[in-house]
Curated annotation (Swiss-Prot):
Membrane topology qualifier: Multi-pass membrane protein
Function per UniProt: The phosphoenolpyruvate-dependent sugar phosphotransferase system (PTS), a major carbohydrate active -transport system, catalyzes the phosphorylation of incoming sugar substrates concomitant with their translocation across the cell membrane.
Parts of the chain that traverse the membrane: 47-67, 102-122, 127-147, 158-178, 198-218, 238-258, 277-297, 319-339, 342-362, 379-399
GO molecular-function terms, A-Z: protein-N(PI)-phosphohistidine-sugar phosphotransferase activity; protein-phosphocysteine-sugar phosphotransferase activity
Pfam families: PTS_EIIC (PF02378)
Ranges of the Cytoplasmic topological domain: 1-46, 123-126, 179-197, 259-276, 340-341, 400-415
Species of the source: Escherichia coli O157:H7
An annotated GO cellular component: plasma membrane
Protein name as annotated: Fructose-like permease IIC component
Places the protein is found: Cell inner membrane
Sequence ranges on the Periplasmic membrane side: 68-101, 148-157, 219-237, 298-318, 363-378
Superkingdom of source: Bacteria
Domain PTS EIIC type-2 span(s) in chain numbering: 35-410
Keywords: Cell inner membrane, Cell membrane, Membrane, Phosphoprotein, Phosphotransferase system, Sugar transport, Transferase, Transmembrane, Transmembrane helix, Transport
Length: 415
């Protein structure tokens, strides 16, 4: 008996087994057509974990480095052991350490949560554990077993984690594997509990263990290690190219799957102290600020209102959300006129982020907007990069819309 998702309609067959009546429209969907929906399901469930971890981590950094004025090169534990803090300040520092530890744990669950819900979206709740295990192994891979012929001893070594690449691959493969096994392994009704609580979980866990150890971790780790080696070897040029790529990927879909993938790459490099997260954090806030600014300056520059009436209040909302680190406020502009909005905020994000990185702005803390600004090195340059990118975005979108309006390709409802 196959365990079906709740959304399926179940009818009893002649043998007493249940068969799902497939939605005709869903049956026409190809693998590639369904895949983005499954990935977005994982991303949407992962985001709260990232937010919780990020905000709690931000509290720890703000308390330690802004309020208590600990030097940036000193860790919180070192500050605790320095003997320089007592009374209320010591209590604050202990709370900062707790927040840092707890926030770090929450961040560590982001990728496993993503993988678990992608697998769940594909194969139902039976695939959830396999996805979670695979996601956890992508961030905390199993030690490699090696034989050293010089000492005639076995030893272990730590592989390079496959991170987001590995989590994405294993969640998809595990989801479809569990879905296939659930459909193909038919047992009598009285063995249903055995199938769901023992057989499928054990088989899927063994598969995840072998696939991650022998295939996915080596492959994903090789890609991640290669990228890091190239960027590190390239020095300043590599850092600027990385900034441009991360900024473009961050801005292109405003919180969508490409944005989230860029976030995992950036967070991975930042966590390992390979490259800072500066470009990504700047690119998050430039699109909504720039598009909001465009709704303020369009009439002053052109003498015309170039946006539909409902976009003007949304522009102000987008600017406010940008200071909270939320780029989705720019989505209405991208939906209303993608040909003018998307190129404008991508160019603005790339130029502003790259300029800030080139001029020496550095942010290691993996958050954006006001949550991280107190911890930025060269904050003036950092803010100048945001301003530059926002102005470029605003000017580009205004003049692109003006050109389209004059050519009759843009209709504006000014009511």
């Amino acid at each position: 008996m196959a365990i079906k998702k709740r959304s399926a309609t179940v009818v009893p067959g002649a043998s007493g087994a249940a068969a799902a009546v497939k939605n005709p429209q869903a049956s026409k969907s190809s693998f590639w057509g369904e895949l983005p929906q499954h990935v977005m399901s994982g991303i949407s469930r992962m985001v709260p974990t990232l937010i919780m971890g990020g905000v709690i981590l931000a509290f720890s950094q703000l308390i330690a480095y802004s309020w208590l004025k600990i030097p940036a090169e000193i860790g919180i534990m070192d500050a605790l052991n320095s003997g320089k803090f007592s009374g209320f300040d010591l209590s604050l520092l202990k709370f900062a350490w707790l927040s840092q530890s707890f926030g770090g744990v929450l961040f560590g669950f982001a990728i496993p949560m993503f993988a678990a819900f992608v697998a769940n979206s594909i194969g139902g709740k039976l695939a959830f554990p396999a996805g979670f295990i695979g996601g956890l192994m992508s961030t905390q891979p199993t030690q490699l077993l090696n034989f050293d012929p010089s000492t005639m001893q076995w030893a272990t070594s730590s592989p390079v984690p496959s991170t987001f690449i590995g989590a994405l691959i294993i969640s998809i493969v595990a989801g479809y594997l569990v879905k296939w096994m659930n459909q193909k392994i038919q047992l009598p009704d009285f063995l249903l509990a055995f199938k769901t609580t023992f057989l499928l979980p054990i088989l899927s866990a063994i598969f995840v263990m072998l696939a991650m150890y022998y295939v996915i971790t080596p492959f994903g780790g090789w890609i991640n290690g290669g990228i890091r080696t190239v960027l590190t070897a390239a020095g300043e040029k590599g850092a600027l190219m990385y900034a441009m790529g991360i900024a473009a990927a961050t801005a292109i879909d405003l919180g969508g799957p490409i944005n989230k993938a860029a976030g995992f790459v950036a967070f991975s490099f930042t966590t390992d102290h390979v490259l800072p997260v500066t470009a990504r954090s700047i690119a998050i806030v430039i699109p909504p600020i720039g598009l909001g600014l465009a709704t303020i300056i369009d009439r002053r520059l052109t003498g015309k209102r170039l946006f539909n009436a409902q976009l003007y209040p949304q522009g102000k909302t987008a600017m406010f959300l940008a200071f909270m680190g939320i780029s989705e406020g720019a989505i209405p502009f991208a939906l209303e006129s993608p040909i003018t909005a998307i190129p404008s905020y991508m160019v603005g994000a790339i130029v502003g982020s790259t300029a800030a990185v080139w001029l020496g702005a550095v942010q290691w803390f993996p958050e954006s907007a006001i949550w991280a600004w107190p911890l930025v090195t060269n904050l003036g340059v950092y803010m100048a990069g945001i301003a530059l990118g926002a102005v470029i975005t605003a000017l580009m979108v205004v003049f692109l819309r003006l050109m389209m309006f004059r050519k009759g390709k843009l209709l504006i409802d000014s009511l």
